[in-house]
């Protein structure tokens, strides 16, 4: 009963998706809606997986400790030399990788964001605490449903801030404690230099005379406010001016003036009313305008007594000292008393707690025999067996569990056991790092753009193109060994012909581990690569010379001058053939038959397909170039209009390219200058030629000539 009772201030799990981890929230309010349901106003906490990798790197940098220590040689001479180092927490170094991985799941990031969620989505309680530097990190792992935080995340600004002020540690910031003095022993310090006297208790004035002087000081303050224009606007009535003049700042200034004038009342009154006019003393309550006071109350309602955030977001033109001073003066006003009574009345009417029964509905991600398709006969599973059957748990690699849950992308067919599924829902990660972790580095990806036209366009969907999805497989040594040791189980040729069938990687890994000791005794014989001799390569290059370079593109004027009527000739389209053996223009036009016959046929009602055409120098319209002027009209039989010709067929778009640099290519890249690198990027079809001076290291300078003869200086 008590476990299902949730109160204001509890940290709870919320479920917003059946496959995603729970949300961690703190209940601020419990409100009852008009239809009778209960909504919880909660404070959001974010996991590491919810924020960007850049902010995660900043959080890890914040977690490093700054160690300060004294240098040995300088301490003897009375000189303090301090060296600051950044080093990792020694306790984190001692933790194994598995515990480090699980400890990251316990870290949260507090936010100031509030949201309202249905109370029926609560799935349990948890505990969240501020990171305690004196506690052991293992203590957070030993307690169930326990989390910690140290930074504040702003989801709007995408920033991280420290939740508490940092205390500087070291000899430069801490005082040196002296030895305890014996009874009657003096410390030898001059107290007059260390302290400033502001009031004499044994003064010649009586209490009645001091009270009368303070009444005169209040009167002077009221008269000064009547003369001040800004004060008369803020305190339009005499009653308000007298109340403002009776505040502490006026009385403290009067007593300080009396002390400076050696408790002579006549001199003190003369100091309160100098020649320029009466002295006006105002505190923060008078300095702040009504709009600033309303902003402060709004900020206090949102942030509480977090004065740093109040200054940054609401009152950046006010100092932190001014805000704190105004807060304590504001607590003495009637406005504060009224708001306190209203909040108490609202709290009485609101819900204090709510009972949520256990959630017993089955999860849609559960894997059962009834909701899966039968396995393929030629696949790894038997007939009637689920495609994921035989797979180990992606987290703990177990093959036995009373309940399995699908996890990850559907095409991966990954699954988790019951205990790892509960861990995933609560902590937002797996017990062990997996292949789906986003922290692992991947290959650099480059999308090629043909002729400068982007393959993926964010404009009209008519011009948008999408290439076939590419992938990159980077195998490990154990995978390459398993291909040879477990060939009869893996059946690589069969798997290559049927890439959609799953492979039982757990069974292959176990079999490879068992056969590995025997295979080490008889080393594998690798097939040697047969390389042709240099003479054969040279002979081939002589018989197959490089084709000549194309002529440079002529200007439009030369094209106009050379346009002459010619007979009809077949048009050769440079588009690449598609899967069905047709060119891209054939798919656009939808015309079959012989190319020569189509050109001699009548237009058949198709637009821009006239028989008469002018032949000139061959020049294609570039995709990224400028079109011909509007006066020049080039009509080509059996071709497309220029606007339609610029559109690329998605089948003709190139596949993605993965470039894996080697040590040799990295060395060559360092030899190129910045201009040569940019030139090669602009013209990728041209070979890069290295000069001999670039390839060879610079020669050392020649030695200076040595002259054995003495130098004679004549007068």
Curated annotation (Swiss-Prot):
Residue intervals of every GATA-type zinc finger in the record: 393-420
Residues with Phosphothreonine modification: 564, 578
Motif SUMO interaction motif 1 (SIM): chain residues: 711-715
A molecular function GO annotation: transcription corepressor activity
Mutagenesis or variant effect for residue 182 to A: Reduced ubiquitination. Significant reduction in ubiquitination
Any one of the GO CC terms: NuRD complex
Keyword terms: Acetylation, Activator, Biological rhythms, Cytoplasm, Cytoskeleton, DNA-binding, Isopeptide bond, Metal-binding, Nucleus, Phosphoprotein, Repressor, Transcription, Transcription regulation, Ubl conjugation, Zinc, Zinc-finger
Domain of life: Eukaryota
Pfam families to which the protein is assigned, alphabetical: BAH, ELM2, GATA, MTA_R1, Myb_DNA-binding
Residue ranges constituting the BAH domain according to the UniProt record: 1-164
Cross-link (Glycyl lysine isopeptide (Lys-Gly) (interchain with G-Cter in ubiquitin)): 182, 626
Modified residue annotations for N6-acetyllysine: 626
ELM2 domain mapped to chain residues: 165-276
Location of the motif SH3-binding: 545-552, 696-705
Similarity remark: Belongs to the metastasis-associated protein family.
Name of the protein: Metastasis-associated protein MTA1
Species of the source: Homo sapiens
Gene that this polypeptide is encoded by: MTA1
